[in-house]
Curated annotation (Swiss-Prot), chain B:
<dbReference type="GO" id="GO:0004070">
    <property type="term" value="F:aspartate carbamoyltransferase activity"/>
</dbReference>
<feature type="binding site">
    <location>
        <position position="169"/>
    </location>
    <ligand>
        <name>L-aspartate</name>
    </ligand>
</feature>
<dbReference type="InterPro" id="IPR006130">
    <property type="entry name" value="Asp/Orn_carbamoylTrfase"/>
</dbReference>
<feature type="binding site">
    <location>
        <position position="59"/>
    </location>
    <ligand>
        <name>carbamoyl phosphate</name>
    </ligand>
</feature>
<feature type="binding site">
    <location>
        <position position="265"/>
    </location>
    <ligand>
        <name>carbamoyl phosphate</name>
    </ligand>
</feature>
<dbReference type="GO" id="GO:0006207">
    <property type="term" value="P:'de novo' pyrimidine nucleobase biosynthetic process"/>
</dbReference>
<protein>
    <recommendedName>
        <fullName>Aspartate carbamoyltransferase catalytic subunit</fullName>
        <ecNumber>2.1.3.2</ecNumber>
    </recommendedName>
</protein>
<feature type="binding site">
    <location>
        <position position="223"/>
    </location>
    <ligand>
        <name>L-aspartate</name>
    </ligand>
</feature>
<dbReference type="GO" id="GO:0016597">
    <property type="term" value="F:amino acid binding"/>
</dbReference>
<keyword id="KW-0808">Transferase</keyword>
<feature type="binding site">
    <location>
        <position position="136"/>
    </location>
    <ligand>
        <name>carbamoyl phosphate</name>
    </ligand>
</feature>
<dbReference type="InterPro" id="IPR006131">
    <property type="entry name" value="Asp_carbamoyltransf_Asp/Orn-bd"/>
</dbReference>
<comment type="subunit">
    <text>Heterododecamer (2C3:3R2) of six catalytic PyrB chains organized as two trimers (C3), and six regulatory PyrI chains organized as three dimers (R2).</text>
</comment>
<keyword id="KW-0665">Pyrimidine biosynthesis</keyword>
<dbReference type="Pfam" id="PF00185">
    <property type="entry name" value="OTCace"/>
</dbReference>
<comment type="similarity">
    <text>Belongs to the aspartate/ornithine carbamoyltransferase superfamily. ATCase family.</text>
</comment>
<dbReference type="InterPro" id="IPR002082">
    <property type="entry name" value="Asp_carbamoyltransf"/>
</dbReference>
């Protein structure tokens, strides 16, 4: 039996959500002082780039942007095998920064835990805040996002996917039912 | 692409895609060694035993550091401290090690095929850290990573490997690896150090170093393995140095941007002059640095290999 898919956010809705998150980041941090964005590969890094552009449009400031690959920090090597390891690229000192960790979908929280471990190994940020486009619930760890594009109640068996075009722009968020 | 090898026994069994995946993974792991906290939790809870039945400083230390940087528990066993000196067979040693439930055994042995023997009989993953005159896959992979970093590509390059080809597992693994990635390989050494039929591996054979080095992008010098030489192989080290030693004048025959490699340890003044060994074209310490990253990649990839094989069935 085939899967059924529902589009829960289209391109315009994603754009509005990212703009709102950018405003919330600025309000929460009272500007861009010491703020830096770090996207989680892959998906979060593309969204972090969009947020950087939004912050630039609103404040006229280009905040530092980095990317973190969490493959080395996953806790499921035994069950999933050795996945391809990507590059972590954080071209600024992490120490003392207010890091906005960006991911596309927040699910169990294990990816975020791994990303925080990876960041802590690189330096000592002042704090880490979490921005996600979709929070679908089913947390297995005590992790709560600071900025959310859309809360989407889901069943554990469903999938939520953020699709990007060739220019890595987010075009839709789909909910897939088995 | 998935890596579905449980063991790393030699380059001969690998595809070009396998080699590229290992090099790409090593590039990512190299960043870990450049941080202030040089450790990731990737292999937490895994046990790696380095069993070295032959003397080694560089390779053993490199594997040990690689394991530790991935948070594995690493244990070293050398021939002098193993029960082999008390007459235990390799199979009995292996079975005893297996009973201690290691995940990976890194093995160096003077007999070609010893790691294969172990891999067929035991449950753990085996990584060949050099077996006799057969293969030294991790050395060839770190050589390829160094070449790729310095040249940007491997395909189309001309690589001259010079020295004791007969006894060199490094040369054999490099011929396989470079051929698979599309490089032209030249082998050069005195007739007594070139095994008959070596060209069947896919390399051109030269007896004059000047011809082998001319126009080369990479010049890889091999150590004269004095401990393995019979009296009939070399009249004298001085004569070898005169005819096959890499000097600044000979390097001028290679391409201007050619790099000089050596798997170490070097016999300065024998196969390579100090002026070349310390010159601007040498990448010998880059090879050592890349060795840790390549071995991290191998430990990581074989740790998932078994599961991927299972899931493919």
């Amino acid at each position: 039996m085939g899967k059924s898919e529902t589009i829960i956010l289209d391109e315009a809705a994603i754009s509005r959500a990212l703009t709102r998150i950018a405003h919330e980041i600025l309000e929460h941090n009272q500007g861009t002082d010491n703020v830096a964005l770090v996207g989680i590969r892959t998906g979060g890094d593309h969204l972090a780039l969009r947020l950087q552009s939004r912050l630039q449009d609103i404040e006229g400031v280009t905040v530092p942007l980095g990317t973190v690959d969490i493959t080395m920090y996953r806790d499921d090597l035994a069950s999933r095998g050795s996945l391809p390891v990507g590059k972590t690229d954080i071209p600024f000192p992490v120490d003392g920064k207010r890091i906005i960790l960006v991911d596309d979908v927040l699910f169990t929280g294990r990816t975020i835990r791994a990303a925080m471990d990876a960041l802590m190994d690189i330096g000592r940020p002042r704090n880490i805040q979490l921005a996600v486009l979709v929070d679908r619930g089913h947390r297995e760890l005590p992790i709560r996002p600071d900025f959310v594009g859309r809360n989407v109640p889901t069943a554990a068996s469903e999938q939520v996917m953020v699709r990007f075009d060739d220019q890595l722009r987010p075009v839709e968020v789909c909910l897939s039912k088995p | 692409m998935a890596f579905n090898h449980k063991h790393i026994l030699g380059i001969e069994q690998m595809s070009a895609e396998d080699i590229t995946l290992i090099l790409d993974t090593a590039e990512s792991f190299k960043d870990v060694s450049l941080r202030s906290i040089k450790k990731v939790p990737t292999l937490r809870g895994k046990t790696v035993i380095n069993v070295f039945f032959e003397a080694s400083t560089r390779t053993r230390t490199s594997f040990e550091i690689a394991g530790k940087r991935l948070s594995a528990d690493t244990v070293n066993i050398s021939a002098s401290t193993s029960a082999v000196v008390k007459g235990e067979t390799l199979e009995d040693t292996a079975k005893n090690l297996e009973a201690m439930k290691p995940d990976i055994i890194v093995m160096r042995h003077s007999c070609s095929g010893a790691p294969h023997y172990l891999a067929e009989r035991c449950d753990f993953s085996v990584i060949n850290a050099g077996d006799g005159a057969h293969e030294h896959p991790s050395q060839a992979l770190l050589d390829l990573l160094t070449i790729r970093q310095k040249k940007g590509h491997i395909e189309g390059l001309t690589v001259a490997i010079i020295g004791d080809i007969t006894h060199s597992r490094v040369a054999r693994s490099n011929v396989y690896a470079l051929n698979k990635l599309g490089a032209e390989v030249r082998l050069c050494g005195p007739g007594t150090m070139l095994p008959p039929g070596i060209e069947r591996l896919g390399a051109q054979v030269f007896d004059r170093i000047d011809d082998a080095v001319s126009g080369a992008d990479v010049v890889m010098m091999l150590r004269i393995q004095q401990e393995r030489q019979g009296k009939t192989m070399l009249p004298s080290l001085r004569e070898y140095s005169m005819f096959y030693g890499l000097t600044p004048d000979r390097m001028k025959l290679a391409k201007p941007d050619a790099i000089v490699m050596h798997p170490g340890p070097m016999n300065r003044g024998v196969e390579i002059s100090s002026a070349v060994a310390d010159g601007p074209q040498n990448v010998i310490l880059d090879q050592v640095e890349n060795g840790v990253a390549v071995r991290m990649a191998l430990l990581y990839l074989v740790s998932g290999g078994e599961k991927l094989e299972d899931s493919a069935q």
